């Protein structure tokens, strides 16, 4: 039996465009439900205890929020459904007892050892939850680590987040029977913490998949000017400031001939200078378009008509938007950082995140009709094989079976 923790998904009701971690937890839940394997669903409840979710409630909630994010149902009706199912799930968690979960996680004499699986960082800093779980049942604890960015780059994190994330990593290195990571970059960042803990649990490197819906038929580009897209929460490490300053200059120099910049993502924290530019800079009003929420179907249509995806981030653990863009055949201009190099390989173009002139030259080149430079990347894309969720889960299923059999 696999008990998958859905705490993060339950916290995302009404939050708009899903983050990469949201997508991962959804993908795991959908895979587990579709597989028909023995499964349970759990979430953290008040008092730092884990409680069982009724299986039908969990399955209905997962289906509803998946349809919402993909844009495959009426938005207003779907939002009401997600909120109603979310309330039902939270009531069940609030009323549930940890004893019921623990009884599920006690192995039968001839069955494989059950697994408690946490694929977000949600409540991983609460060491006592996992200490109690390990003390009271024989279940294997497997968790997925997405990145160590708050520890490596505390200047880009909220105050206190570096210490909080360090507690998460310490919990994982102390209590996890096995670990899953999304990239070799994340594995290498995690290794010193494992060395310090003096434990060597098995670590699986399993890149995430990108299975976007097919592009809509017969729809042309949503804008009549060349445009570029940046898909990201607006926060300091994502380096929106580089693009906004560049676009302000392009607007002043080119006027209506300037390409458009479309920003897709929620506004984050400590980005006053970026928000001020978005809200108050006259030069950006006609050239920068902000979309806080966008379902997958609309995202595919937007990406399909773009000149390139832009990713000027200072730090990443994986880079979901990059594989999604490349999967659609859209060129990408990226920061020259290890995680994006690992994902983009020899296909994307890479620049120092502070190289304003380099970014500017590439953007103007890619914006031009018949750009040879853009065509060269499109040609390289022909030999690129996108990672698939099916491959990810084939590796993860084998890994979990091996850990449960130990």
Model-derived features: positions:
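Carbohydrate transferase catalytic cores enriched for Leloir-type hexosyltransferases
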Residues: 1-406
């Amino acid at each position: 039996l696999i008990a998958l923790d859905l705490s993060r998904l339950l916290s995302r009701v009404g939050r708009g465009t899903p983050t990469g971690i949201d997508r991962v937890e959804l993908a795991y839940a959908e895979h587990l439900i579709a597989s028909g394997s023995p499964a349970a669903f759990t979430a953290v409840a008040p008092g730092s205890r884990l409680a069982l979710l009724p299986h039908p409630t969990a399955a209905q909630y997962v289906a509803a929020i998946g349809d919402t994010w993909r844009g495959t149902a009426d938005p207003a009706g779907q939002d009401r459904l997600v909120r109603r199912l979310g309330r039902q799930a939270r009531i069940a968690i609030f009323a549930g007892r940890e004893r019921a979960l623990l009884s599920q996680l006690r192995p039968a004499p001839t069955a494989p050892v059950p697994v408690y699986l946490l694929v977000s960082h949600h409540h991983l800093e609460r060491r006592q939850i996992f200490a109690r779980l390990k003390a009271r049942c024989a279940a294997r604890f497997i968790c997925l680590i997405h990145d160590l960015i708050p520890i490596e780059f505390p200047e880009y994190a909220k105050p206190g987040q570096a210490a909080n994330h360090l507690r998460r990593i310490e919990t994982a290195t102390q209590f996890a029977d096995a670990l899953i990571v999304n990239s070799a970059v994340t594995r290498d960042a995690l290794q010193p913490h494992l060395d310090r803990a003096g434990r060597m649990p098995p670590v699986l490197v399993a890149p995430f998949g990108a299975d976007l819906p097919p592009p809509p038929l017969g729809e042309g580009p949503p804008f009549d000017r060349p445009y570029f897209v940046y898909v990201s929460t607006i926060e300091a490490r994502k380096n929106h400031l580089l693009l906004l300053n560049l676009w302000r200059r392009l607007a002043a120099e080119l006027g209506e001939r300037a390409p458009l910049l479309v920003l897709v993502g929620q506004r984050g924290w400590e980005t006053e200078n970026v928000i001020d530019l978005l809200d108050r800079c006259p030069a950006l009003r006609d050239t920068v378009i902000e979309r806080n929420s966008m379902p997958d179907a609309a995202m595919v249509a937007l990406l399909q008509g773009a000149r390139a995806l832009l990713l000027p981030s200072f730090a990443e653990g994986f880079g979901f938007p990059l594989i999604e863009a490349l999967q659609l055949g859209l060129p990408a201009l990226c920061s020259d950082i290890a995680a994006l190099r690992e994902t983009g390989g020899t296909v994307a173009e890479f620049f120092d995140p502070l190289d304003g002139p380099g970014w500017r030259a590439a953007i103007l080149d890619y914006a031009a009709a018949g750009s040879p430079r853009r065509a060269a990347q499109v040609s390289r894309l022909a030999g690129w094989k996108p990672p698939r969720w099916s491959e990810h889960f084939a590796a993860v299923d084998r890994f979990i079976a091996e850990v449960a059999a130990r």
